[in-house]
């Protein structure tokens, strides 16, 4: 998913590049979760940005000792569809790009869906923090992530 808030020409280039390598890119809109749910139920691999809240309606998590907002989408999709939720972190090395996958984050047995999504999203943040501390230069963040730091 991506936001088409980019200038039209830049968004088209972004879209064209990803589609040429076999990706289906979904714009962020009201049908996105329904489309993603259908793809998940049909066994498709879905990659979602999980370290930045583009919707401004994210879940508050503890990240490096400060409150940050992460998107609810990855955990919500897993709760609603039963799809496996895995984290991935990209590291750039002299020998190329390495992608580190974490073990599955399971849907908690207890709590309502909102509590389950919050707990799973905090686990995503915890795993991301662990990798971020190893190689902070590999994190490309252009948005404000910690509101309390000004």
Give names to the regions the model predicted.
Residues 8-15:
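Nucleotide-sugar donor phosphate/pyrophosphate-binding loop at the beta->alpha transition
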Residues 24-28:
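Short acidic-hydrophobic, aromatic-tinged amphipathic segments that line or gate anion-handling sites
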Residues 31-150:
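Non-catalytic C-terminal accessory region of glycerolipid acyltransferases
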Residues 18-19:
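A conserved, positively charged/aromatic
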């Amino acid at each position: 998913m991506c936001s088409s808030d980019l200038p039209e020409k830049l968004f088209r280039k972004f879209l064209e590049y990803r589609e040429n390598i076999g990706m289906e890119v979904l714009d962020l809109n009201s049908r996105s979760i329904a489309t993603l749910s259908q793809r998940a139920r049909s066994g498709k691999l879905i990659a979602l940005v999980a370290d930045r809240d583009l919707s401004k309606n994210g879940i508050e998590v503890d990240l490096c000792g400060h409150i940050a907002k992460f998107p609810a989408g990855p955990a919500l999709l897993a709760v609603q569809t039963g799809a496996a939720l895995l984290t991935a972190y990209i590291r750039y090395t002299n020998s190329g790009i390495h992608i580190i996958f974490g073990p599955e984050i399971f849907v908690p047995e207890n709590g309502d869906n909102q509590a389950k999504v919050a707990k799973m999203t905090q686990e995503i943040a915890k795993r991301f923090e662990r990798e971020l501390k190893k190689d902070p230069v590999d994190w490309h963040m252009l948005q404000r992530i910690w509101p309390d730091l000004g």
